[in-house]
Amino acid sequence: MMLIECPNCGPRNETEFSYGGQAHVAYPEDPNALSDKEWSRYLFYRENSKGIFAERWVHSGGCRKWFNALRDTATYEFKAVYRAGEPRPELNTQGGSR
């Protein structure tokens, strides 16, 4: 069992959460003006890097609020969690979390 830190409720079981994709992806200002290729890039093209990755999560089995997290995709370890709308935190060089 893995615990995920909800910024509103505290640590909870991973089964209470749902993954929401890459964080900090801006919605197009005028989606109707996009070509099919540009729209498909917005919808489907995301980073797929190994290491620290900013992600969106929702506490679907709890407060039902969205938040962002920095997670190491190689180890699954959550390095930091922060509320939606807040800037991405800087991690210190020792791998500490917020």
Swiss-Prot record:
* Residues that hold Zn(2+) according to the record: C6, C9, H59, C63
Q: Which GO terms describe its cellular component?
A: cytoplasm
Matching entries from Pfam families are given as: SoxD
Q: Where is this protein chiefly located?
A: cytoplasm
**Could you tell me which Gene3D superfamilies the record lists for this protein?**
Folate-binding superfamily
InterPro entries membership: SoxD, SoxD_sf
Q: Which domain of life is it from?
A: Bacteria
Q: What is this protein called?
A: Sarcosine oxidase subunit delta
Tell me what organism the protein belongs to: Corynebacterium sp. (strain P-1)
